[in-house]
Each structure stands twice: as C-alpha cells, then as structure tokens.
Amino acid sequence: MSDPKLKPVEDALVTVAKSSQIQLAKDDTSGGTIVGRLLQCQYSKTHKFWETQPVEQFKDIQDTSLPEGPIEPATLVSEVKQEPYNLLGQFEWTICDMNSDDMCLEMYNFLKENSPDDQQIKYEYSKEYLRWALCPPGYYQSWHIGVRVKTSKKLIAFICGRPTRIRVRDEVVKMAKVNSLCVHKKLRSKGLAPLMIKELTRRVKLQNIWQAAYTSSHILSRPVTTSRDWVRMLNPKKLIDVGLTRLRDRMTMSRTVKLYKLPDAPITPGFREMERRDVPAVTALLRNYLSQFAVATDFDDNDVKHWLLPRENIVYSYVVVSPETHDVTDFCSFCNSSITIPGNRKYTTLECAYACCNVATLTSLSQLVNDALIVSKQKGFDVFYASDVMQNESFLKELRFYPLCRQSHYYLYNYRLRNALKPSELGLIL
C-alpha cells in the first residue's frame, strides 16, 4: 500500500508529490493509444505479493458473481497478530516521532536522497510540511513506521498511513490512507517493501480498521481507476532554462512567454483567501460537490481546518464570496512542493503547485482554476499540476495544460468495486 500526500503532495512522499518531469508528449493525439498499449503490457505481468493480498485481481474481472464490498470479513482485534513481523537480523523496527525536530530533519534528508522518482530531481519537504501531511487530527504515531540498521541506527526505510473516511457508493468506510513507502535506494532488493506493507496492515487492523486507500505509479493489481497528470507552465522561461522542457517547433521564447502569460490579478469578483470563518461553508460546498462521485473523501469541519486552511508554503485555499448575499459560492485550493535542481548555475529550486480540489457553483470551473493559476503565479510558483479526476478534464486543454506520461493508479485494499471507474467518477483527495 503506497502513495503520498507528500508527492502530491499527493510515491515518494509521494504522496502529496507527482512527477516533476515536464517533458511534454511529442504527439498529444496518439499518447492515449501508446499509454493504453503500455498498460496492457503491464497488466500481463504478475505481482506475487499483491496476488496474495485482499485486493481486486485481474483474473476476477469477468466474474460478475463477486459482490461489492469487503473482500475479507473483519475479525476480532484480539485475533490480529500482536507482535511485529520479523525483519532480517541486521534491521529493527522504529517509530518515527514527527513531533521531534531531529526526526523531521532525518526524515527530510532520507526522503530527499531516496525518492523513487527521477534521480536528478530531489523533493524538499520542510518539517512543517511533513507534520501537516503525516500528523492530521486523530493520527496514530504507531503508523509512522521506520526501519533502522541495528548497529548504526541509520534510517533505511519508511512507511506511514493515517486514518480517513472514504465514501464508496452510499457507504462511508473508515480506512487507512497510505501516504508513503520509501526504501533506501541501495536496499531495494532486500524484500523490505512487502514486509513493511504487512506490518502497517497489522497495525491498522489493531485499530479495528480493515480497509485502505493508496496510489502508485505502477500497476500492482486491478486499480479502481487510473488518472493522468497534466501540467501548466507558469514560468516557461525558467522551465526551458533548466532543461525540463524545450521550445516547441516554430516557437520563440518571447512567443512562448506570451502564450502562457496570465492576468496580473484574479478576475472573479469576491475572490479572496480562505479564512477560518469560512470552514463550515467550505465543508458544505465540498460535501455537496463530492456527493456526485462514486468514490470520494468524506470531509467534516476538522478535516477542512487541517487540510485546507491556508498555511504558508504548504497549502493555499481561496473562496469566492457573493457581493450580494455574502455567501461562499466557490472554492479552490492547491498545495506545493519545492524541488532541488542540481547543476544549474542560475536556478537552484523549482516551485510546484498541485491542484487539490475545485468547487464551482456560480463561477465557471475554468475561470475559477484560472484565478488559481493567477495567484499561484503571484506566489512565485513555476508550474501547476492537475490530474483528470473529478471534473478537471473540462478545463485542462482550455487553460493550456499539457498531458504528461505519468499516471496515478488508485487502489482500495480489502474492498471490491464491481466495475472500474472512470477518472471523472473519482472524488478522492489523497
């Protein structure tokens, strides 16, 4: 089970981060076909570990007799294995206390140096960001699981989860949201990942929680759905200068900059930063909006306070307030991640914004997201990411987003859906 708020944020801690490679597809019209063929090849591969887990299997796709719901029934907590799984002799389990500044610094360095994404790109997660992503209200410290070398005490692996509520059809299910799975790059052949997943699963069950949600850039089993990541350049000159994209054919730098230029200020009347007093209204907007999706996050006021109230350098949220009624009518948000750019004399970091959730009722969705692009540009972001879940597909091309090759596969652990979903049927904010 893996994914991140730290990716995106969002699989490195990942989880709250998506791929920051901005190399655009050469042929947008054929990309879907190519991706489809690649996925078919991946589907044919077997994953021995996941074939032993209570997850949806490809062999069951045509079996209409299988019911929706839990794959394995819950048991008594007293029947759950009480002792941790055994590690190889030179390793030991540890709890990662994110309230400790020293632990946060160690985690920062570990994730930065061992991100499973592009080796040339290093994600930067401040201690404030790590605590926001990993320690929401009601979190379990025992779910922040590390592996150390016994002799040196060096951290060499990390997995974590947090409790959440996810509505599947008409049922709200308590689940674990798996935020991150990261193993030291030199130890990935030691078989640690499956063991860490089993250990986290054991600890989740000890809290009487029997389902989980996670994402991965890899095909592990049959996904609930698969989304594609899209990118919108905010600072094209910088992105071209650092080599993350290039000028398109017959385009000059000045024409490219002009193509992606945004207004100096948001254009929607009543658009302002979200405040604490807006929490009940934003919660109501979110719950109403997410009710249309087959699988969605179940938000309450406490969730909104933690995940969506603005925090500098972490999450940015905005509302539209009607000038006539003074009601909150629309909402948009994005979180951020900084990336180290090695070997560039002019730039050392890239600032990335990731769309969280956009709810448009009186404002058009494209105008609302365009305002989000404007304020993210004002805040100094260089690039803006979004995936084609929920209703996002409706604005992507209009606002000059371009598709990336990277995809995110969404999974439910110990829960079966009879049919896979379209990305537009998914309302998970992970």
UniProtKB/Swiss-Prot annotation:
Its EC number is 2.3.1.97. The lineage of its organism: Eukaryota, Viridiplantae, Streptophyta, Embryophyta, Tracheophyta. May add a myristoyl group to the N-terminal glycine residue of certain cellular proteins. InterPro entries: Acyl_CoA_acyltransferase, NMT, NMT_C, NMT_CS, NMT_N. Belongs to the NMT family. The keyword Magnesium does not apply. It catalyses: N-terminal glycyl-[protein] + tetradecanoyl-CoA = N-tetradecanoylglycyl-[protein] + CoA + H(+). Keywords: Acyltransferase, Transferase. GO terms for cellular component: cytosol. The active site is at L430 (proton acceptor). This is Putative glycylpeptide N-tetradecanoyltransferase 2. Transmembrane segments: none annotated. One of its GO terms (biological process) is protein localization to membrane. It comes from Arabidopsis thaliana. Tetradecanoyl-CoA binds at H47, K48, F49, W50, L181, C182, V183, S189, K190, G191, L192, A193. Pfam families: NMT (PF01233), NMT_C (PF02799). The keyword Transferase applies. It comes from the Eukaryota. SUPFAM superfamilies: Acyl-CoA N-acyltransferases (Nat). One of its GO terms (molecular function) is glycylpeptide N-tetradecanoyltransferase activity.
